[in-house]
Amino acid sequence: MRLEAEEWREISYRHIKGRKRFRQRLFCGERISADDLNYNRPRVCPACLNERPIWWAVWDLGLVTACPIHGCLLFNRRPACRRKLAWQRLAIHQCRCGLDFRDLTIESADPDLVAINTAIYRAAGFPHGNAAELALANCGFPAQLLGLRLGPLLRLVLFVGP
């Protein structure tokens, strides 16, 4: 990608400067904790990659484990050998071993998991689809939860748990 320095800064997860803000990052314009990011292993939605081979930043959030657009679980391991996906790959959609993630069979996610991931996508400003919005409405989350900004929503989901 040929981006100017300012463009790179805009898409990076920058530290937020200031007193007691060392552990905060800027994620797509929203303040989140550094702990909210998934540094260990990448996750992908094969169906999303099949439609458009781009990396969605929302997949970098640690609590995002399902794709609300396709109602499926994200992959973080290769199905055959169960090895972790690597950050360094031949292409966004291709494993170092040559496996094309777009060819993987998707696994349906639990509707409640889809609903909470829809809330996260929405708070992060990412598209999530009409079906996901309907699943979110049927889940019965309080309006106050759905009105939270991304950082507080991630904290609440983390502390309340499943």
Where are these regions (language model features)?
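C-terminal accessory regions
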Residues: 1-162
